[in-house]
Each structure stands twice: as C-alpha cells, then as structure tokens.
C-alpha cells in the first residue's frame, strides 16, 4: 500500500524536538516501510531537509505557516491508498477533497472533539469522511462517542509503545552502566532518586512532587527529586509556572535537580537514574507515554488515575495507581513504601518490563496499525464492488 502520515503543525518529524506523536511515528515507521511505501508529512525545521528519504521512508516538510494547505496541494500529486491524519479532525475535509480516492484514518491522541475545538457540523463531517478512527486510550474513545455515538463502529483503541532496544532494563549490565554514568553526571551518587519527566506545566503536576519531597526529606535525607523537561518541547525559556517551581524548590535545592529539556534519544538514560518514577498528571491525560517508558526501563512506577493513565498499569502489579492525585501525602505513602520494600519494588518493575515486552514494543504497535490500514483499504474496496 501507499501510506501517508500527516503530522500536526506543532513539531517536526523525526522527533528531534520530542512529542508523543512524533516519537510513535519514529517507532512504527521502520516496520511499516518494510512492507509499504510510506510518506510522512511534517512541518519544516532548520535542522531538516524539506524533502528526503531515510531508511525507505519519504519525508516532505512545509513551513508551519499555511502547513495544512501545502499538504493538501501536495496530496493532489500522489495517489495514496491510506492517509493517516494525526490529531486534526478539522483538516479531514480538506485532505479528502485533495485526495478523494484515499481512505482516511484519523488517530486521536487528545480530546480533539471537544465543543470548544470543533463544531457539531465539522465533527460529524470528519467522522463521516473517515474510514477508521484510532484513539490512544479507552478514555479518549469514550470521550468521542459521548458526543458522537455514530463514531463508535469506526474506532479501534491503539495504545502506543516504546523501542525496547533503547531501554536496557536497570538490572542488565548495560542498564547498570548507564545508571552509574548518569548518576555521576548529575552528582547523585547513591542517593534515592525520584524522577519526573514531562513538560513543566501545572497539568503535569511537578509542583505536587516538590510538596511531596518536603515531606519525604524529613525521614529520608538521602533522597533527590530529578525534574526533567522544559515549559514546552525543546523550550527551556522561563514562564510564570516554571519560575514558581524554582521558587518552590529553593528551600530544597540540595534535594532537587532540574535537568531542563533532554533530547528524546537521551530520555531512556535519564529513566535509568531513578529508583522510583512518578507520573503526577493532574489533568485527564489521554495516556502519558512516560508510563510505557518507565516500565520499559524497569523502574518502579507510580501514576495517577487520571484519564487513560491507569489503562496500561495493573495496580500493585506493574505499578501503583494513585486516586488522590492532588494530595502530596498520597505520593509520600506510595514512594516511601517502595523505598522501604525494595524486593517488592523490583518484582513490580520486572512485571512492568515483561508487560511492555509482551504488548507494547513498537513492533506490536506497527502490526496493530497495519491491520487498521488493511481493514480501511479492504472496506473501501468492498464498497466499490
């Protein structure tokens, strides 16, 4: 099949500046391009050529300004069997007009059918023009069908994944060496490390973890909170919230390290520094990919029961799920339990790694996506007979 991926106007592909969508595309494209002719559309970046082919995958990039129209014009020059539109239902009609014979697959990585984001008319039209819809979680699926019940028959839940080759677990020789190297880099030594990875925004909850640390250090002087991320992908500029975090952390500066933005290819190494990873999402997260990453690295995981986060974590088996998500004391209890019970923490971490190996390597994701594309293609062929 001739496949096209149309990224959003937010970030370039490959994921040189991060982004969950871009990282998933990077993960599945090597597998899909082995069997199919794959073209990826994304915004341009000064570090990338406007057109190039890398490992059988074709990339076409346009400036952010007028991006969607540039893509639509380019589609007219091709004959794609399936066009996969990422997270932009509003653009479906434009792309379908540009390539009317193509089957459209829409993937939803956020709650893009909110009333403030799309009208009833545009929402219905987008659903009617798509052959298949994928969602990153049951949570996002349920949010969509609550407003547009007619979409249900088209939806497949498509969980993301990781490149396991990038995540040597902490108990392997390679993982142990990386752990030691990065602990030396940040001057951590043998201290217990609580890790946060994500955008520095109130919705992600790093402030909750600083309040948690205040309580933890009363009983654990050898504990460090490592906060990895910037205010936006690859953006380390300060805003009011980041300034607030720094001020909040000032009394605990000996126990907190801000690494700022870390390139995506280095993130697996950051995970290996940790003794406990905490996904402190305060909003109804579609499903944070850091949950997959922590389990892949073999790090004991604590996550909040917000949005889709709990869907890929088995409570008390592959991670600990916190319901009282905005209460620092709930995090203290979970973190302290894992610190005090290393055998249990290790058992849980190994369960998590095994769970990822069995279900969420990017090869698994690519196979599930390919089935959606084939079903979309065959469904349209049958309709035309």
Can you say where each PLM-predicted feature lies in the sequence?
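Nucleotide-activated donor-binding/catalytic signature segment of Leloir-type glycosyltransferases, i.e.
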Residues: 229, 239-262
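Short His-centered aromatic/hydrophobic patch
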Residues: 85-91, 108
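Conserved donor-binding/catalytic core segment of Leloir-type glycosyltransferases
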Residues: 4-6, 134, 177-179, 183, ...
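Short hydrophobic beta-strand element within catalytic cores of glycosyltransferases
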Residues: 300-303, 313
